[in-house]
Amino acid sequence: MRRVGQSPSAPVSRVIRTGTKGSAGRLAFGPVDDRVYVGYAGKDAVADRGWLLGHFKDAGDPRHSEAVEIKWSVHPRADARAEWVRGEERTALLVLISGRFRVELPGRSVLLEEQGDYVVWGRGVDHSWFAEEESVVLTVRWPSVPGYAVAAEGGAGPRA
């Protein structure tokens, strides 16, 4: 498969998959070289509580960024954030991939019901969330800054 404008001799990276579409048989590919990473969000997200890209990745990893964070989240029905994020310093975009997901904002509740529904909130807007059905959401936040992790049982986790 070649993209428009791509040299016919340019190598093509593919994610290697086993099993059928939607099965658990998919394999994440890894670093192709020091500047390219090919992966599968469903598997890669498990390593950092959903976070695929941000300041918390190793500096030599192509997924390291001080500018932006990206999270792939799979939430079971009735999953809820343990506590509100207060004193937010980032801007965030949350996109519903599947399911039914509610974002709680001060004085307002936003229900994402259809694939592609999204909400954006800026600096200083506290928030929380609740999965009304099993849901998959993609979150993009900027800039990428330490903090905000909800302490997990037995200590703080890498991200929230």
Protein language model annotation of sequence segments:
Residues 107-123:
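Short acidic-glycine-tyrosine-enriched beta hairpin
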Residues 123-148:
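Ligand-binding loop in jelly-roll beta-barrel domains
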Residues 144-160:
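Short peripheral tails and domain-boundary helices/loops at the edges of structured domains
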